[in-house]
Amino acid sequence: MRTDSKTPLLDTIATPTDLRRLKESDLAQLADELRTETIDAVSVTGGHLGAGLGVVELTVALHYVFDTPHDRLIWDVGHQAYPHKILTGRRDRIRTLRRAGGLSGFTKRSESVYDPFGTAHSSTSISAGLGMAAATTLSGGNNNVIAVIGDGSMSAGMAYEAMNNAGAMHSRLIIILNDNEMSIAPPAGALSAYLARLVSGGTYRTVREAAKQLGRHLPHFIYDRARKTEEFARNFWAGGTMFEELGIYYVGPIDGHNLDHLLPVLKNVRDFKETGPILVHVVTQKGKGYAPAAAASDKYHSVNTFDVVTGVQTKPKANAPSYTRVFADALVKEAERDDKIVAITAAMPGGTGLDVFGKAFPERTFDVGIAEQHAVTFAAGLATEGYRPFCALYSTFLQRGYDQVVHDVAIQNLPVRFAIDRAGLVGADGATHAGSFDVSYLGILPNMVIMAAADEAELVHMVATAAAYDEGPIAFRYPRGEGVGIELPQIGEILDIGRGRIVREGTTVALLSLGTRLAEASKAAEQLASYGISVTVADARFAKPLDLDLVRRLAKNHEVLITIEEGSVGGFGSFVMQALAEEGLLDGTGLKFRSMVLPDTFLDHDKPEKLYAQAGLDAKGIVAKVLATLGRENEAHQSLIA
């Protein structure tokens, strides 16, 4: 063991098997060292810090008590999984988190056998764990299944659906409720820890079950009164009535940072073989053990690289405001003139910019929790009463409320405004957070209008257009990160629905862009001029309805028409192809049509600009596509390697 190391005990741990060889008295030191290593690693890579620091002791205890990976351990969302990764054979790569070719910022099945289920979106762990538990029963296995879920994730309906099913199935599933917001119970003390150890023990549960069997032979009113007395006494001290009503045996709350409390309870839960789900309620603190993160958990939930000593984060100087901030400021200006404008977010006020709107109009701002289905239908309800709701969600999270978009909004043609943030590729969070599919899945819906901002000034216009549009649902999408630095209008212009614009006139090739690929299309046009190719560049603005006049003009007046978008197959390019086919513009006209979309694969984490280059959606890729389409393959190849 190295004597000069800051983490001498952790240095001896390659896998949880090594951890389980330690004495219990060593675990507190191991937890301290694991916390130190987590802080140091995230200071280098950036990422989700506070949640991981809050579960260090819990992570150590779970891997010590349970036989992972034979016992399945699922981390809901995965923000808190960095300490888990360090203990499960990935410490040597922990400083590659969220970088190209490095570790994912979430749990990932292809990364480790210790990650039995991939996560990133919230509230999935209980459902997945219940499926694993049912499979264990069917196959006659004996492994435990443990799902760790935070109290924030418990606001999603999926978690309650899973718990309701778990209680009815009587499958053996262990749920760890990580309460790090004090939203369910106050801090746990010695008495509650003692009671948790008592009621989780085999003796108590065996006697309780025997009493139930005996009670069934007593007169009903006596049995019922005894049952209620026992439940009242236990829940008075420990809480958990709601879980018991769902058929889940509740234990807790206990201090999630006290190993002397955690270990005996987890051992009792592990060793008692009665079927049925168990929930262990642990109370933790986000950012535990690192003063800057503990003092400002919201600011240290997700961080840039930072100085470990001071906690000061490294933030590159912005060259332009972010699209998110431009949206927020534009919405505030619209709301100053229209008191019917309201805003809805699903537990992401800061991420969507609605914290800015909330400061200006707190009574008109609704944070509904991690509940996208509810958010969409809640917005629909507001729309029925004459309000103008803006439902601001990340593209990837809007997927979670898709049936509500179809059934509650589109079919009823209600004027809900969808502000779709993080459209396109997002970078370090990878495939789970990419906004690749919204144009495809919204564009097939009757009544839906879809816009995509080419730059931040266009976004201001689209906010104004959405605010003024009362004929039905309307969506506008925009990416993560900074704008291009264009001057912003003071007041947004209301755009003509379904009308695009020409930004550069040419004669041979037409590039029809949707969204922020417009800048790359314009660069490509400049480069293609050196090849003697005259290029028209157009901004579609609308994916639906299409500007058919513009499409006809581009198709009839050019040899080549190429659509470019930051989305998957089945989106804007497919809509244009359908229109061309219906108009007969592909019938022996000689037009060469191509569609540039994201590849039919899930792209891993990297910087967005590198991912777009990988997908061929940068200026170099567009130049190569044009040259190849014109039959100049050698030049196309040379342009890519230049």
From Swiss-Prot:
GO terms classed as biological process: 1-deoxy-D-xylulose 5-phosphate biosynthetic process; glyceraldehyde-3-phosphate metabolic process; terpenoid biosynthetic process; thiamine biosynthetic process
Residues involved in Mg(2+) binding: 151, 180
Cofactor or coenzyme needed: Mg(2+); thiamine diphosphate
Swiss-Prot/TrEMBL keywords: Isoprene biosynthesis, Magnesium, Metal-binding, Thiamine biosynthesis, Thiamine pyrophosphate, Transferase
Ligand binding (thiamine diphosphate): 79, 120-122, 152-153, 180, 290, 372
The keyword Transferase belongs to this UniProt entry's keyword annotation: yes
Protein EC: 2.2.1.7
Pathway(s) of this molecule: Metabolic intermediate biosynthesis; 1-deoxy-D-xylulose 5-phosphate biosynthesis; 1-deoxy-D-xylulose 5-phosphate from D-glyceraldehyde 3-phosphate and pyruvate: step 1/1
Organism domain of life: Bacteria
Record's catalysed reaction(s): D-glyceraldehyde 3-phosphate + pyruvate + H(+) = 1-deoxy-D-xylulose 5-phosphate + CO2
Cited InterPro entries: Dxylulose-5-P_synthase (IPR005477), THDP-binding (IPR029061), Transketo_C/PFOR_II (IPR009014), Transketolase-like_Pyr-bd (IPR005475), Transketolase_BS (IPR020826), Transketolase_C (IPR033248), Transketolase_CS (IPR049557)
PROSITE patterns: TRANSKETOLASE_1, TRANSKETOLASE_2
Family named by the database record: Belongs to the transketolase family. DXPS subfamily.
Subunit organization: Homodimer.
Name of protein: 1-deoxy-D-xylulose-5-phosphate synthase
Organism expressing this protein natively: Beijerinckia indica subsp. indica (strain ATCC 9039 / DSM 1715 / NCIMB 8712)
Organism ancestry: Bacteria, Pseudomonadati, Pseudomonadota, Alphaproteobacteria, Hyphomicrobiales
